[in-house]
Amino acid sequence: MGLPWYRVHTVVLNDPGRLLSVHIMHTALVAGWAGSMALYELAVFDPSDPVLDPMWRQGMFVIPFMTRLGITNSWGGWSITGGTITNPGIWSYEGVAGAHIVFSGLCFLAAIWHWVYWDLEIFCDERTGKPSLDLPKIFGIHLFLAGLACFGFGAFHVTGLYGPGIWVSDPYGLTGKVQSVNPSWGVEGFDPFVPGGIASHHIAAGTLGILAGLFHLSVRPPQRLYKGLRMGNIETVLSSSIAAVFFAAFVVAGTMWYGSATTPIELFGPTRYQWDQGYFQQEIYRRVSAGLAENQSLSEVWSKIPEKLAFYDYIGNNPAKGGLFRAGSMDNGDGIAVGWLGHPIFRDKEGRELFVRRMPTFFETFPVVLVDGDGIVRADVPFRRAESKYSVEQVGVTVEFYGGELNGVSYSDPVTVKKYARRAQLGEIFELDRATLKSDGVFRSSPRGWFTFGHASFALLFFFGHIWHGSRTLFRDVFAGIDPDLDAQVEFGAFQKLGDPTTRRQAI
């Protein structure tokens, strides 16, 4: 046939049987990739430390999606929340992966069957004897089935009526677990961070889809609309399908990057805005202030800060710190977190508490500046020693740790103080193992960053595809160079003067 690579899909034009076949094969490839990727991730995943080495630090991509839908146990005897289990059941991580691979194999066989047996009676228009598809009817069927699945997910799976529920956590990602969710029918259901909105919106959208599907099955489109939107052309279906997909891709890119109830930080890592706004730092200080108000010592209150909360307050977990071509997991960058060293409190020789200015997201290097409670600069690590006025040596800065592994330890020698001041720029200080994975010390992004980048990129690409195929189907006659009135113009007797549409003969 000699088709160029960008026109190979014309082989399934006007061939409904093989059009169905290639779509089934595509489903086989997608399901096969998902199952295989899940098995690969399970082979390399280390579940031993869900606090300091969670799935998102290890670069897991499909495990978080399984987990948010209610899968938490493995046939390997471990649970995602830590600890061991004896009876994981069939719907474990491996069970879901296996189901996808089996489904992929069945789709593969079905695709081959439909490719061989393409000329089925069901695809034949009995009036013309030619292959054709009733596209508005197919649209109604698909809309009805999609609505049914959407309603079922919201009403049964999410609510726990028949299913496990979904992953739900607190605002600081500390107490997450799989649980059933009640639908939120009030205005709070529109809050993207309220899990109840997931149930209610799926129920509402599913109901709408079912009703719309029944409408399109029972009502035929008006002839003018049918012709105007080219409803008989399969490329119209392609164009509108691409529109639905790119719109969905833009939406999920947004919910992933900015955060929502559907993208919990325990599964995908924190967002960059939580670092920018000092979200976890504020919560830590709130807890410390509450403890001090109850006459607890600094050592006591900082020792009660959960290691998980402190770990979120570290710039290495910011998904925007990864570079565009830095492949690999976060653990391959700054290393595997081993333990929290504690919170460093810096003081000058006059006893003032000093705070290290934190590094903004888009800086690779940043000056070490220590300010007091009023924001006045009191100490720094100068670029030129000859010009310095506020150097650690001159100001006499000391550091003492509270909580963590160095609880109660203090340092006064300038070299050590400057070392911890530099590290305090990056948030809470952790001991990181860079030897095990030969980590290079350069920050990586989390799956949150990869997902956003991938879906935003493909959304832009698919937007172009929608415009392209929409234009092709709407202006097919123009692109083909065929004027719809051409036959009328050359027909003998249609016009009093040949080719002049203003002299059209009137029918008597």
From Swiss-Prot:
<keyword id="KW-0602">Photosynthesis</keyword>
<keyword id="KW-0793">Thylakoid</keyword>
<keyword id="KW-0472">Membrane</keyword>
<feature type="transmembrane region" description="Helical">
    <location>
        <begin position="203"/>
        <end position="218"/>
    </location>
</feature>
<feature type="transmembrane region" description="Helical">
    <location>
        <begin position="140"/>
        <end position="156"/>
    </location>
</feature>
<comment type="similarity">
    <text>Belongs to the PsbB/PsbC family. PsbB subfamily.</text>
</comment>
<keyword id="KW-1133">Transmembrane helix</keyword>
<keyword id="KW-0157">Chromophore</keyword>
<feature type="transmembrane region" description="Helical">
    <location>
        <begin position="237"/>
        <end position="252"/>
    </location>
</feature>
<dbReference type="GO" id="GO:0009772">
    <property type="term" value="P:photosynthetic electron transport in photosystem II"/>
</dbReference>
<keyword id="KW-0934">Plastid</keyword>
<dbReference type="GO" id="GO:0045156">
    <property type="term" value="F:electron transporter, transferring electrons within the cyclic electron transport pathway of photosynthesis activity"/>
</dbReference>
<dbReference type="GO" id="GO:0009523">
    <property type="term" value="C:photosystem II"/>
</dbReference>
<dbReference type="GO" id="GO:0009535">
    <property type="term" value="C:chloroplast thylakoid membrane"/>
</dbReference>
<keyword id="KW-0604">Photosystem II</keyword>
<feature type="transmembrane region" description="Helical">
    <location>
        <begin position="21"/>
        <end position="36"/>
    </location>
</feature>
<dbReference type="Pfam" id="PF00421">
    <property type="entry name" value="PSII"/>
</dbReference>
<dbReference type="GO" id="GO:0016168">
    <property type="term" value="F:chlorophyll binding"/>
</dbReference>
<keyword id="KW-0150">Chloroplast</keyword>
<keyword id="KW-0148">Chlorophyll</keyword>
<dbReference type="InterPro" id="IPR017486">
    <property type="entry name" value="PSII_PsbB"/>
</dbReference>
<dbReference type="InterPro" id="IPR000932">
    <property type="entry name" value="PS_antenna-like"/>
</dbReference>
<comment type="subunit">
    <text>PSII is composed of 1 copy each of membrane proteins PsbA, PsbB, PsbC, PsbD, PsbE, PsbF, PsbH, PsbI, PsbJ, PsbK, PsbL, PsbM, PsbT, PsbX, PsbY, PsbZ, Psb30/Ycf12, at least 3 peripheral proteins of the oxygen-evolving complex and a large number of cofactors. It forms dimeric complexes.</text>
</comment>
<protein>
    <recommendedName>
        <fullName>Photosystem II CP47 reaction center protein</fullName>
    </recommendedName>
</protein>
<feature type="transmembrane region" description="Helical">
    <location>
        <begin position="101"/>
        <end position="115"/>
    </location>
</feature>
<dbReference type="InterPro" id="IPR036001">
    <property type="entry name" value="PS_II_antenna-like_sf"/>
</dbReference>
<feature type="transmembrane region" description="Helical">
    <location>
        <begin position="457"/>
        <end position="472"/>
    </location>
</feature>
<keyword id="KW-0812">Transmembrane</keyword>
<comment type="function">
    <text>One of the components of the core complex of photosystem II (PSII). It binds chlorophyll and helps catalyze the primary light-induced photochemical processes of PSII. PSII is a light-driven water:plastoquinone oxidoreductase, using light energy to abstract electrons from H(2)O, generating O(2) and a proton gradient subsequently used for ATP formation.</text>
</comment>
